[in-house]
């Protein structure tokens, strides 16, 4: 099956798995998805992720979701911002704050995929991929 928006598909799979209280979610892997998963892990939104290579041409990324002690998901919401039909770019000075700084904005910059505070520190702007809170 062809997916027009792989990042949107990734976010939807994570959102659906959180709502269904699944412990893991798997999807086809790519470098961009791995970079997003790395940021989500570093920021504490997911427990872990692993890229599994089956030896053929297909790689799979498996994300282990994180839940709070009362069984609520650590990820309350995900929103795709820049879409294939409408790309959204921002300057360093205009990087949006998500939920008053409690959320996370993930950007694709010339220095790689970065969280909002990392892009600010690196003094770069870029494409706003998604918001996570």
Curated annotation (Swiss-Prot):
Coiled-coil residues: none
Entry's Gene Ontology cellular component terms: ribonucleoprotein complex; ribosome
SUPFAM superfamilies registered for this protein in UniProt: Ribosomal protein S8 (SSF56047)
TM stretches of this protein: none
An MF annotation (GO) of this entry: structural constituent of ribosome
Database matches in Pfam families: Ribosomal_S8 (PF00410)
Gene Ontology biological process terms from the UniProt entry: translation
Key words, A-Z: Ribonucleoprotein, Ribosomal protein, RNA-binding, rRNA-binding
HAMAP family, sorted: Ribosomal_uS8_B
Family: Belongs to the universal ribosomal protein uS8 family.
Function of the protein: One of the primary rRNA binding proteins, it binds directly to 16S rRNA central domain where it helps coordinate assembly of the platform of the 30S subunit.
Assembly with partners or alone: Part of the 30S ribosomal subunit. Contacts proteins S5 and S12.
Name of this chain's protein: Small ribosomal subunit protein uS8
Organism: Chloroflexus aurantiacus (strain ATCC 29364 / DSM 637 / Y-400-fl)
Higher taxonomy: Bacteria, Bacillati, Chloroflexota, Chloroflexia, Chloroflexales
Name of the encoding gene: rpsH
